[in-house]
Structures are given as structure tokens and as C-alpha cells.
């Protein structure tokens, strides 16, 4: 189950954020269509994890749930921090906090984080991994606001199976 949490939620969430970012900025219509198909496929992977883990997590002890909740939180912290090349900041003698703030205010990092955590956080909430113990940590991380977004477990399989609409 830790592999599913890591892969189906965090890694696939990173992939979805990356592909959605690329789709939003590319002027190439063919690449946009290809990215649309990739995003649909990645969404299926996330949905599988949500649907499976929702039932699995329900049957764990409170201690086991907390372990998984902390694992997911730590993975989110790592995912958020990977957007900032702090080793580069240090190499050039830049203040890490100032460089991180500048990078965040430049737009790309904050938009990528929004795309990532607007998928990951509601999914973690749906499967019961936003526990009372980790909820304040997510709040401090600045991503708890995404809890009310739609989780991926409700994705329409019929919609995902439709062929690409080329008229748009």
C-alpha cells in the first residue's frame, strides 16, 4: 500500500501536474492533443489507486493509518521542495529563502504546486489520510486549501474511454 500511495498519488500527481503545465503552455495543437491523451491515461492510474486504497485504508488500525498519513505527508514535502533547486541556490551563494520566494512568485512553481496539490490533497482526504495529526502539517505546508477540490476517485470511466474530440 505504501507503493500505491507513493506512486498512484504522489508520483502520478507529479506527472499530471507536469503534463497539465505543458499542455497549458504549448502552442502546438498536436502536442496539446497528445498531452490530453497522456493526461487521461495518468488519471486512470490515479483513479485506480484512490478506489483501491479507499477500501484498504478503512480496514487498518489507527496506528497503521497514522503511519501511512505521515508517509504521504513526507512525500508531499519532498515533492514541494523538489521544485526549488536549493543546491543551485547554495552554489551561487544565494539566500535560499529569498531565492525560493522569488521562484515561487515567478509563477511557474506556484502554478505547478497548485496543479499537484489540487489533485493529491483531495485524494488523500477521500481515503482517510488527512488525519487530525497530519492536518496541521498540511496547513503549515500551505496546501490544505485544496482539500475541498474534487478527488480523482469519481472520474467517469465512460468519459475517459471516449475518443479524442478533434473538433475543439
List each model region and its residues.
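A ubiquitous short alpha-helical element
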Residues: 1-7, 36-38, 104-106
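Alpha-helical bundle segments that constitute or directly flank the non-heme di-iron/ferroxidase center
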Residues: 1-25, 79-84, 96
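Charged/polar, low-hydrophobicity segments characteristic of intrinsically disordered regions
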Residues: 45, 49-54, 114-117
Amino acid at each position: 500500500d505504501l507503493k500505491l500511495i507513493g506512486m498512484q498519488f504522489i508520483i502520478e500527481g507529479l506527472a499530471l501536474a507536469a503534463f497539465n503545465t505543458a499542455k497549458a503552455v504549448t502552442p502546438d495543437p498536436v502536442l496539446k492533443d497528445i498531452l490530453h491523451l497522456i493526461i487521461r491515461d495518468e488519471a486512470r492510474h490515479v483513479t485506480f489507486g484512490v478506489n483501491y486504497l479507499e477500501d484498504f485504508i478503512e480496514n487498518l488500525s489507527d496506528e497503521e493509518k497514522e503511519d501511512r498519513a505521515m508517509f504521504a505527508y513526507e512525500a508531499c514535502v519532498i515533492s514541494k521542495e523538489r521544485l526549488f533547486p536549493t543546491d543551485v541556490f547554495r552554489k551561487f551563494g544565494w539566500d535560499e529563502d529569498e531565492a525560493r520566494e522569488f521562484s515561487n512568485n515567478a509563477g511557474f512553481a506556484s502554478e505547478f504546486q497548485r496543479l499537484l496539490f489540487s489533485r493529491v490533497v483531495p485524494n488523500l482526504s477521500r481515503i482517510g489520510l488527512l488525519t487530525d495529526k497530519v492536518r496541521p502539517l498540511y496547513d503549515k505546508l500551505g496546501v490544505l486549501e485544496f482539500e475541498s477540490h474534487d478527488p480523482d476517485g469519481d472520474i467517469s470511466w465512460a468519459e475517459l474511454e471516449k475518443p479524442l474530440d478533434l473538433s475543439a
